[in-house]
A protein has these predicted regions:
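N-terminal amphipathic/basic leader segments beginning at the initiator methionine
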Residues: 1-39
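Mg2+-dependent prenyl diphosphate-binding active-site environment of isoprenoid biosynthetic enzymes
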Residues: 44-282, 289-302
Length: 306
């Protein structure tokens, strides 16, 4: 069986070495199709302005990395990442939670960003009140979609998603409270694990639960990839290109936010991101060929340019 068939993504065989960009494009196309249907369902309801803003937020592009991690993790453990599977439901719910977090993070009271993925942020395209309601609505839609099945594992996944979302909010609160203060390395790592790491970790663990009913020892993979992702994000904010990223760069430094690169330097931060990735790969090694996509995603987390 080709990898594409195993993933439920109909686009032919994947060449070796693993083409991660092609894999992400296929996952993104598949996820976008489902999100488009969810958004279309909302547009049949009132008020129309809120439904349009939800669609604008959901279909704003992006790598769809978190859904890809869910599906790859599920596949790594022999689960069904197909269109009728629980893994896809969780992947879509997780992406809706992630999207809500971006909409709220961009608000003037938070990060005050005008641009996201090369487009005006929701509060700029609409208004601040609508952006708040979009985030609120996406939270509800996420859990309604996930729980719209009789599968008993959905309850465990809903609890995982709720915990991840709560930790993300706690991380944002820590981040806001830390502006202008000098944090210790342990405090920075705690912030990173919550603000960004929580949903990355939930993606990996959620895929395992969808496949087997339990995390199956993938919690360390989720934690390590969450750490590596946030370090890479902080490095991109320091050294990335605004046009390529589709958003403002240098904002953390300008706001006086504590990041790992600001504490230990760019080179050491890169080394630690690579080390975290290597530790995740070591856990995945015994899973063999079924974990090929998940291993490729782990490497992508630290090598990405956007």
């Amino acid at each position: 069986m080709t990898h594409a068939a195993a993933s439920g993504i109909d686009s032919g065989p994947v060449t070796s070495p693993f083409d991660i960009e092609d894999y992400l494009r296929r996952v993104s196309g598949r996820v976008d199709g489902h999100l488009r249907r969810i958004a279309a369902d909302q547009k049949r309801q009132r008020p129309a302005r809120l439904a349009e803003a939800i669609e604008y937020a959901l279909l704003g592009g992006g790598k769809r990395l978190r859904p890809a991690l869910v599906l790859a993790s599920c596949e790594a453990l022999g689960g069904d990442p197909g269109d009728d599977g629980l893994a896809l439901r969780f992947a879509l719910a997780l992406e809706m939670i992630h999207t809500y977090s971006l909409v709220h993070d961009d608000l003037p009271a938070m990060d005050d960003d005008d641009l996201r993925r090369g487009r005006p942020t929701v509060h700029k395209a609409y208004d601040e009140a609508t952006a708040v309601l979009v985030g609120d609505g996406l939270q509800s839609l996420a859990f309604r979609h996930l729980l719209g099945t009789g599968d008993p594992r959905a309850a465990a996944l809903a609890a995982l998603l709720a915990d991840g979302a709560l930790r993300m909010v706690q991380g944002q609160a820590l981040d806001i409270g830390a502006e202008g203060r000098k944090l210790t390395e342990d405090e920075v790592l705690e912030l990173m694990a919550a603000k960004t790491g929580a949903l990355i970790s939930a993606a990996v663990v959620g895929g395992a639960i969808a496949a087997t009913g339990s995390p199956r020892g993938l919690e360390p993979v989720g934690r390590k990839l969450g750490l590596a992702f946030q370090i890479a994000d902080d490095l991109l904010d320091l050294t990335g290109d605004a046009a390529a990223l589709g958003k403002r760069v240098g904002k953390d430094q300008a706001a006086g936010k504590a990041t790992l690169p600001s504490l230990v330097g760019v080179d050491e931060a890169r080394r630690r991101a690579g080390a975290a990735c290597d530790e995740a790969l070591a856990v995945l090694a015994p899973l063999g060929a079924p974990a090929e996509a998940l291993r490729a995603l782990a490497r992508f987390v630290v090598t990405r340019k956007r």
